[in-house]
From Swiss-Prot:
It is an enzyme of class 4 (lyase). Its EC number is 4.3.3.6. It holds the Pfam family SOR_SNZ. It comes from the Eukaryota. The gene is PDX1. Belongs to the PdxS/SNZ family. Keywords: Lyase, Pyridoxal phosphate, Schiff base. This is Pyridoxal 5'-phosphate synthase subunit PDX1. It comes from Cercospora nicotianae (Barn spot disease fungus). The active site is at residue 130. Induction: Accumulation is enhanced two-fold by light, but is unaffected by the presence of cercosporin, a photosensitizer synthesized by C.nicotianae. Signal peptide: none annotated.
Amino acid sequence: MASNGTSVSPFRSQKNAAMAVNDTPANGHAEPSTITAASKTNTTKITSQNDPQSSFAVKVGLAQMLKGGVIMDVVNAEQARIAEEAGACAVMALERVPADIRKDGGVARMSDPQMIKDIMNAVTIPVMAKSRIGHFVECQILQAIGVDYIDESEVLTPADPVNHIDKSVYNVPFVCGCKNLGEALRRISEGAAMIRTKGEAGTGDVVEAVRHMQTVNAEIAKASSASDADLRMMARELQCDYNLLKQTAQLKRLPVVNFAAGGIATPADAALMMQMGCDGVFVGSGIFKSGDAAKRAKAIVQATTHYNDPKVLAEVSSGLGEAMVGINCDKLPETQKLATRGW
């Protein structure tokens, strides 16, 4: 149970110990075109210091520790404690949930570091924070204050219209969004240790997350049955690394964890994405924009754990109060769709 004082996070202690042994040099460049140990197990053997491949494997292993869990958006320490008590595996610290970012408009930037540190001090579970696409200085700041994961997020206003961040030069594991397999593999090639669907954050409409997961699954299935020549052609079409695509085809899944995000608002939504093959879920506006946040948070955690048990799903879906009103994605103008950001 977290207290009002500074909390000691067992996860953070373990992460810092692992990264201290396997420190990536400030100007080092990992080349994660082939991933081995971390795609098979939650623990990674560290083979040598300053080895980019080994460092990347450690980050992938840290991301795998969240598998099967729910990551919740929180805007203050009180919400973070509610999320932790509900069973969240991590929290995403940000000043405004995506629904408010949509409503308020303007430029959405990295959150105030002090607010993030307050949340880190309030809970013992991992804390994530968002940076703008391409804004490597925001990532330097987030790493400096000790966040556990960084989300290079399309929810914030992109800082670079062309380039994503070279994530390999940071010790902190990165999570990035995707709409399709090409985007996912490009982000992994840049050093992302965790992938999520983009969906349409802040809408409460799960349809885009479903679409993105279906697309990734279909493209992996196509790659898995392709000849070597066809696989090389597919890599060119997807604009991704051939070796990484080949590994994905052999695994019949992404070589890093793949969570669902964007529009998940109910326990049924969470179970739907898990049954489609996701490794866990992000829930943003769906919890703290609902009638009973604490009860809904617990219900979504239970639904994510027991996603194949309709009786449990029926039980945890009952009596939750009003869900967030939401926005129908079909009514969103293209200019308001966050998933189109990035490439």
